[in-house]
Amino acid sequence: MDAIRHGLALCPEERKTNGIVAELSVRENIALALQARMGVGQFLSRAEQTALAERYVKLLGIKTETVDKPIGLLSGGNQQKAILARWMAIEPRLLILDEPTRGIDVAAKQEIMDQILRLAQGGMAVLFISSEMSEVVRVAHRIVVLRDRHKVGELPAGSSEDAVYDLIAAEHA
C-alpha cells in the first residue's frame, strides 16, 4: 500500500502466483491497485470498475469476451496485459517490470513491448528486468548489469547485444 501511495508499481515475474488473483474477474484484477490507492472506506463502483477495465481491454488488446470473465481463464499473455493495465490505471512514477514477457506468445510479447515503449516515451520511468537480451537493448535508455546486488557495469542506449554479453562475460573472467 505504501508503494502504491508513493507511485511505485510492480509487475512480478511470477504472474500466476504474485500477479493475478485467478478467481477474480478481469475487471476486479484491473481495478485492484486503484482501489488500494483510494484507501479503506472508499470504493470504486461496479460501473466505475467496468469502465476502467473496458478502457484498458481496448487500449491493450486484452482478448476476453467480457470483463467479468475470471482472469485465470485468460491466456498468459492476456493475463500479463491485465496486470500491466492494473498498474497503468494508477499512473505510477516508477513501473518495475520483472520478466514481463516470460511465458507468453510472440504476438502478446510484441504488444506488451510496444506498450512499454509508449509508456517510457510518455515520460513514465520504467525499470525493465529481463533475461531476453534483445528486449533489453530494444527498450533500454541505459543498461545496468548487476551481480550479487552490485553494479558491475553500465552501457548507454543503443548498445548491441554483443556489448551486453561482453560486459557480463568480463565479470566472469
Task: Map each language-model feature to its residues.
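Glycine-rich phosphate-binding loops of nucleotide-dependent enzymes
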Residues: M1-A173
